[in-house]
């Protein structure tokens, strides 16, 4: 987008901002450009992002006074102006960064635990569940396990989750963890965010998301000890629930392949194996 158009959009939110340069962000997974720009200004750098109404609702409803999110300076006709967060993502995970992310997640989820009065804000259960239910017919021989996941999705306690909290949506800035891209944020089953954040971590150095197996295990245990235990959920029940939500993350690639008719992708081959392994572990072989 031309810088003059960017200036026009930003001026509708803050006429005092003087933009000197703009640079489009690129996606970590494929290098394509987002509709997100880093703006160099006469003072502090900013970010302009193309957004949607659920994301705007989430920022305004859950973070009016801040939180593990960028500070927002304004919205205008599908655009959001916010602070630029320097740092690095969780895509090359280390234990220190993981703890920062877990603490930020736990604090926000504790604040909004069982807040059903806020369920209509953003992309909560009422919007998410029907779309997940539609995937059932694409689950090949894994429908029974997927039905068990749907049962858990309906029944477990809910809290604030970013249901797209992939590692590149977690920025570590000093001693602060910041969560980005809240298009799929709202009051959802509690495991959604953690499962999304750690399910795809691999120990291969060239992996899209590098995370040691011991750190994945550590995250599951840390989350229980610092939040879920306090909510009265038995450990065994928690572990089974987390496995179902990990299964959902892997089965997403089965859905994508069957919905598109394209079974040639590496992710389909890899994650269908992992989904079946988890289903067997859960007793749905």
Task: Describe the role of every protein-language-model region.
Residues 88-124, 139-144, 153:
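Conserved kinase catalytic-core helix
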Residues 33-40, 149-192:
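Active-site acidic catalytic loop and adjacent metal/ATP-binding pocket
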Residues 17-40:
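ATP-binding glycine-rich phosphate-binding loop
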Residues 83:
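Conserved Hanks-type protein kinase catalytic core
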Residues 193-231, 246-264:
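Active-site activation/catalytic loop segments of kinase-like enzymes and analogous catalytic loops
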Residues 1-17, 268-285:
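Regulatory N- and C-terminal appendages and interdomain linkers associated
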Residues 231-245:
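All-alpha amphipathic helical-bundle segments outside canonical DNA-binding/catalytic cores
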Residues 32, 43-80, 91-107:
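A conserved alpha-helical element in kinase catalytic cores
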């Amino acid at each position: 987008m031309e810088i003059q158009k960017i200036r026009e959009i930003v001026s509708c939110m803050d006429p005092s901002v003087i933009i000197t340069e703009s640079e489009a962000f690129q996606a970590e997974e494929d290098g394509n450009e987002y509709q997100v720009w880093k703006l160099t200004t006469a003072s502090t750098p900013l970010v302009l992002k193309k957004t949607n109404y659920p994301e705007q609702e989430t920022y305004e409803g859950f973070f009016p006074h801040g939180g593990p999110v960028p500070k927002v300076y304004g919205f205008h006709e599908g655009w959001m102006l916010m602070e630029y967060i320097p740092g690095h993502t969780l895509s090359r995970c280390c234990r220190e960064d993981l703890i920062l992310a877990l603490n930020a997640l736990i604090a926000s989820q504790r604040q909004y635990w069982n807040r059903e009065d806020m369920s209509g804000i953003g992309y909560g259960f009422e919007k998410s569940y029907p779309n997940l239910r539609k995937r059932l017919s694409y689950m090949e021989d894994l429908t029974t396990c997927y039905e068990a996941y749907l049962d858990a999705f309906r029944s477990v306690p809910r809290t604030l989750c970013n249901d797209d909290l992939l590692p590149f949506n977690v920025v570590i800035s000093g001693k602060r963890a910041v969560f980005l891209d809240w298009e799929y944020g709202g009051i959802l089953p509690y495991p959604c965010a953690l499962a999304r954040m750690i399910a795809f971590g691999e120990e291969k150095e060239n992996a899209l998301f590098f995370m040691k197996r011991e750190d994945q295990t550590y995250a599951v245990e840390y989350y229980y000890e610092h939040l879920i235990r306090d909510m009265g959920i038995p450990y065994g029940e928690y572990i089974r629930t987390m496995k179902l939500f990990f299964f959902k993350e892997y089965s997403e690639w089965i859905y994508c392949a069957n919905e598109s008719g394209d079974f040639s992708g590496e992710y389909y081959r890899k994650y269908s194996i992992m989904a079946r392994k988890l289903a067997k572990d859960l007793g749905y072989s």
